[in-house]
Amino acid sequence: MSELLDSIQPYLTKWYVVISALLVSFFIAHKISVARFKATHNCAASPEYYKVNWFSLPLLYRLIQVKREGRLLDFAQKIYDDVKALTFVIKIVGVPVIITRDPENMKAVLATQFNDFALGTRHAHFKPLLGDGIFTLDGNGWKQSRSMLRPQFSREQVAHVQALEPHLQRLAKHIRLADGETINIQDLFFKLTVDTATEFLFGQSVYSLKDAAINDPPTEDFDGRSSFANSFNTAQTYLGTRAYLQMFYFIVNNSDFRKCCKQVHDFTRFYVQKGLDMTPEELEKKSENGYVFLYELVKQTRDPKVLQDQLLNILLAGRDTTAGLLSFTFFELARHPRVFNKLKEEIYEAFGKGDDARVSEITFESLKKCEYLKWVMNEMLRLYPSVPVNFRVATKRTTLPRGGGPDGNSPIYVGKGTTVAYSVYSTHRMEEYYGKDADEFKPERWAESRKLGWAYVPFNGGPRICLGQQFALTEASYIVTRLLQMFDKLELHDDRPYPPAKSVHLTMCHQDGVYVSLS
């Protein structure tokens, strides 16, 4: 025995041998532990996307290519068809990522197993622009943000649709100036929603719809406001790229990105300070003149950083989601004259048209009574959800209820740190729930009472469900109603192939714009 010890003694003193042995032991112990966990939870293997090889480099190149072409979501649909499963695993540079469109798995990630998943590196992705807000935080920080912001989206605040009218009139002037010629209405909608969102949030609009041909309204520091809108757009594009890079987000941190973030922060801090400088009496007086998000938040916190971050988080959500929804709506209405005419008839009957439009009757309550308008909005959010793909990361060893085994009905194992990507876009187009015409724009499908559950989640679900969903729906419905009252002809001027190329960053919109004429 002593001879044996003497013979191995030199190796025991070599640190790399000891460390190697420990690593092998740890690896084996981990494998045994995972196997026991899988057996305990009846987990089965899920399919893998078999075309991945060479460290996923061909796939990564293809993903970058189709994203540039605006075909990322359609490419993902083809992958589902190739794999023939609702849930599968794909390895990106050797790291497994679970991809799912199964409503039961989405329910688990977002609701029933909510505490097993977090945002992962999202905070790091978005922090340079959005800081610590409701969309970037997990845990107690998120809970505090949500409790602070929830009262700001009460029915009383959502119902103030008349505040949209001055901005809508400015939009209408741009359309009339085109005199029936082709316009990119998506560009106008993005300007409209940043104007309405900044007035709602800051108490002062950036008036991005202001134009040399349109003389109103006179504003101070218009150049500063214009640069804010442009900087916010640019910074947001960078954020989208950082999000898709996941753990390699830090690659996107150039001087242009940092400059845009600074301009946005400087602008926002100016209005935050204006709110903080007001006395309680002045804030109350301002509130009597109309609801302003910032002034209500100032009553809850005096921390300028908290105010800035929450305002920018809400601006991100409130501006792009509504603009995208409106753009896709007018795109599909222009493609489907029958639907356009039927919607017009309902609006005319409810609220009049042209010079006889009864604008004061268009309220939160009356819009909800417009059944066909509701069907159109539901169908648009089904086909074009604002956030088509989202991610969560497992905070501990856990499972998803389905996706394993030959039939896909067994639970699957999810290791700690594993990313789960769920595609609302794909779920909303499943024939199992929406029939063989699931890819078609058909508002009438909502005439039937459907128990869709987690197969229809345009505003996410569970504890993190969108606080502003009624606000967005009301704003979009009001704008559609008013534009159809003003313009009774809508034509699409776009000969590009269908489906349209879609830009997918943080939210989704038409990659190349929506070109129509209104008269």
UniProtKB/Swiss-Prot annotation:
Where is the major localization of this protein? Answer: membrane
Q: Where in the cell is it found?
A: Membrane
The protein's Enzyme Commission number: 1.14.14.-
**Where are its TM segments located?**
none
Top-rank lineage group of the source organism: Eukaryota
| InterPro entries, A to Z | Cyt_P450, Cyt_P450_CS, Cyt_P450_E_CYP52_ascomycetes, Cyt_P450_E_CYP52_fungi, Cyt_P450_E_grp-II, Cyt_P450_sf
The family database entries (PROSITE patterns) matched by this protein are listed as:
CYTOCHROME_P450 (PS00086)
Instruction: Look up the record and name the cofactor or cofactors this protein needs.
Output: heme
Arranged from A to Z, the UniProt key words for this protein are: Heme, Iron, Membrane, Metal-binding, Monooxygenase, Oxidoreductase
Q: What induces it?
A: By N-alkanes.
The record ties this protein, via SUPFAM superfamilies, to:
Cytochrome P450 (SSF48264)
Where is it found, in Gene Ontology cellular component terms?
A: membrane
The answer to whether the entry has keyword Metal-binding is yes
Q: Which GO terms describe its molecular function?
A: heme binding; iron ion binding; oxidoreductase activity, acting on paired donors, with incorporation or reduction of molecular oxygen, reduced flavin or flavoprotein as one donor, and incorporation of one atom of oxygen
Which residues of this UniProt protein bind heme? C466
Entry's family note: Belongs to the cytochrome P450 family.
The protein's role, per its UniProt record: Together with an NADPH cytochrome P450 the enzyme system catalyzes the terminal hydroxylation as the first step in the assimilation of alkanes and fatty acids.
- Name under which the protein is recorded: Cytochrome P450 52A13
Q: Which organism does this sequence originate in?
A: Debaryomyces hansenii
